[in-house]
C-alpha cells in the first residue's frame, strides 16, 4: 500500500499542539475591518482550536 500524501492546503492552515489538537487562525480578519469593533478585531488575533467534530477529518488529511 502506498504512503498517504499530506494535503498541503490543510497543513498550511493548521498547527498541531503538544496535546495533539489543531490550532488555526480565526476567520473574519482579512477585509471589511472598519465595520468591526476594536474588541472584536483584538479577539480575532488569538488562534482558535478546531472542534472535535472536524478534528478527526483534518488529522486524516494531514496524515497524523
From Swiss-Prot:
InterPro entries: Ribosomal_bL35 (IPR001706), Ribosomal_bL35-like (IPR021137), Ribosomal_bL35_sf (IPR037229). Disulfide bonds: none annotated. Keywords: Ribonucleoprotein, Ribosomal protein. Transmembrane segments: none annotated. One of its GO terms (biological process) is translation. The keyword Ribosomal protein applies. Residues 23-44 have a biased composition (Basic residues). The keyword Ribonucleoprotein applies. GO terms for cellular component: cytosolic large ribosomal subunit. One of its GO terms (molecular function) is structural constituent of ribosome. Pfam families: Ribosomal_L35p. SUPFAM superfamilies: L35p-like (SSF143034). Residues 19-44 are annotated as: Disordered. Belongs to the bacterial ribosomal protein bL35 family. HAMAP family: Ribosomal_bL35 (MF_00514). This is Large ribosomal subunit protein bL35. It comes from Protochlamydia amoebophila (strain UWE25). The gene is rpmI.
